[in-house]
């Protein structure tokens, strides 16, 4: 029997406490995701070597327990013993390995190890086996597995030849248990983890992937309806803007036509301005005015009224009388108010002066204007003067 130092014993106590806490917390969890081992890294090798050393000591004691295990198989097969792995009757089946550990305690005390440490390790192995098969096995499968697991909780190199016979007896009708027990190396390694990792159905994904619980799945977006209504409102606004844009395009399509019409109007106004510039409004009383500039110069000269009483002496006659015209203006000579009787009829001289001014203002050839002026001088009647006037206008 190998001896344990104080440091190794403290390390085993610490590891067993961690494993027990992991078992307690892992029993209530559903088998949904693959968890991680609660044992720190680097502890597995030390634990496996400790279990092998402990199992090699208890191998003589385990040979005396086949009859007890057969009796426990019969007791567990009864309906009264079909209970979960954490119920009180299940603890009674865990006592034979403990008693075997107590019997082997005297031998271990000689080498320096404590009996309490070995009994606690046995209890820990029993609890780990119960925790592993509890969540996923049925009651019958649990009863078939307990004797095998109790005996398998003491792995050793010496009793490896006795395992196939006990395994065949312990699991007569459970194929799932046979599949787990057939691989001795995997079953022993899983027991060394002390139940921190539950057995679950193998899935396609690897264990390194991060699990995604259903509770953390994001809920469907609740504002999709608001977004859809907003998009519908935006589409309606866009259609309205498109319709208004069509109306604007229809209105602006007439702008080129309006521009062409405005240009035509400008051209017409320019022609009219040219024609108006060529036309002369002649004053019959001022026939000597032959141009528009002369007419404007005459229009600038206007009489100026001097207010005030003034000096009436020049307008008073010797008899003390003053002669006034139609505008009540004083006249120096009263004879100016008396006009001689005039012969009725048009004045030929005025007509000749008017036609002569018209001929001089017209843009004609000098020879043509000279010919018309000679005819005007020779005219002796109103009819001849009017003919010369028409010739000058048609010019």
From Swiss-Prot:
The keyword Transmembrane does not apply. It holds the Pfam family Paramyx_P_V_C. Residues 65-74 have a biased composition (Basic and acidic residues). Homotetramer. Interacts (via multimerization domain) with polymerase L; this interaction forms the polymerase L-P complex. Interacts (via N-terminus) with N0 (via Ncore); this interaction allows P to chaperon N0 to avoid N polymerization before encapsidation. Interacts (via C-terminus) with N-RNA template; this interaction positions the polymerase on the template for both transcription and replication. Essential cofactor of the RNA polymerase L that plays a central role in the transcription and replication by forming the polymerase complex with RNA polymerase L and recruiting L to the genomic N-RNA template for RNA synthesis. Also plays a central role in the encapsidation of nascent RNA chains by forming the encapsidation complex with the nucleocapsid protein N (N-P complex). Acts as a chaperone for newly synthesized free N protein, so-called N0, allowing encapsidation of nascent RNA chains during replication. The N-terminus consists of a long intrinsically disordered tail. The central part contains the coiled-coil multimerization domain (PMD). Forms a four-stranded coiled coil structure. The C-terminus constitutes the alpha-helical domain that binds to the nucleocapsid (N-RNA complex). This is Phosphoprotein. It comes from Newcastle disease virus (strain Ulster/2C) (NDV). The gene is P/V.
